[in-house]
């Protein structure tokens, strides 16, 4: 599935050599924790003034929306965070709703592209191991973006419901065909593909969405390396075993 491009989205981005589109630049390694405000929305290449303005607005909007939600966020606050006049924000994004949708779709696009190009003749176990590792890295590197998406969905997805029931549903159906072929070949447990994705998403995203809970229980101060080092191996093994994944021999 290819998510729609919007103003402010980049062209070519990478997560460990996996192509990612729509404005995020990151290296999704477990030992790298860039500031959300400094990376989301960036293309990583030289751009014109207009493109740089859009990138700055998107970065600022991600932070403000993640803290205040859609209803609580004000365009004036986004403009202040971006360090530009309110009029500039509305020049590039005509309404707050337009900007919010662009930010949310960026997050979703980044997550979906993290799966890479899985194929029926690929290695099921290795493909999902890599996917889970990338999703955990995204949760660590971009917790605000993850929480923003969670807030939108928990509230009933009023802004992006059509996107979820359209492009996201088609994406799950497309990738689900690969899962079904693996199941037919005895390389994956017979679990509904949609529910398999739900399990992967909820387990990996909880490390961002429930950061306060994880810190309280573990005693961690911030998202230090130890938390993700410990979690990654356990989460990957639990999902690989739970999904009954095997190497294609």
Residue map of PLM features:
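C-terminal peripheral helix-coil segments that are non-catalytic and often amphipathic
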Residues: 1-41, 134-137, 141, 169, ...
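Short hydrophobic clusters on alpha-helical segments that form packing/core surfaces
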Residues: 53, 57-65, 135, 239
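Hydrophobic/aromatic residues within well-ordered alpha-helical segments
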Residues: 53, 96, 103, 107, ...
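Helix-turn-helix
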Residues: 56, 64-98, 102
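Amphipathic alpha-helical linker/stalk segments
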Residues: 101-130, 175-181
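Hydrophobic alpha-helical connector segments
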Residues: 116-145, 193-200, 229
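Amphipathic alpha-helical segments used for helix-helix packing
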Residues: 140-162, 210-219
């Amino acid at each position: 599935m290819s998510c729609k491009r919007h103003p402010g989205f980049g062209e070519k981005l990478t997560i460990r050599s996996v192509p990612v589109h729509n404005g995020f630049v990151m290296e999704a390694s477990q030992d790298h924790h860039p500031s959300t405000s400094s990376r989301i929305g960036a293309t990583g290449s030289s751009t014109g003034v207009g493109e740089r303005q859009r990138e700055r607005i998107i970065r600022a909007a991600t932070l403000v929306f993640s803290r205040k939600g859609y209803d609580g966020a004000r365009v004036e606050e986004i403009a202040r965070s971006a360090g530009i006049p309110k009029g500039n924000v509305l020049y590039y994004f005509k309404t707050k709703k337009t900007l919010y949708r662009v930010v949310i779709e960026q997050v979703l696009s980044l997550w979906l592209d993290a799966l890479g190009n899985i194929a029926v003749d690929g290695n099921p176990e290795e493909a999902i191991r890599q996917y889970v590792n990338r999703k955990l890295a995204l949760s660590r590197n971009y917790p605000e973006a993850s929480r923003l998406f969670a807030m939108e969905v928990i509230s009933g997805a009023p802004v992006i419901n059509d996107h979820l029931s359209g492009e996201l549903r088609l994406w799950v159906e497309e990738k689900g065909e690969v899962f079904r072929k693996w199941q037919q070949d005895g390389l994956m447990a017979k679990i509904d593909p949609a529910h398999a994705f739900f399990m992967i998403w909820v387990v990996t995203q909880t490390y961002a969405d429930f950061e306060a809970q994880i810190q309280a229980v573990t005693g961690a101060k911030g998202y230090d390396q130890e938390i993700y080092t410990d979690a990654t191996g356990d989460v990957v093994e639990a999902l690989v075993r739970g999904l009954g994944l095997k190497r294609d021999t």
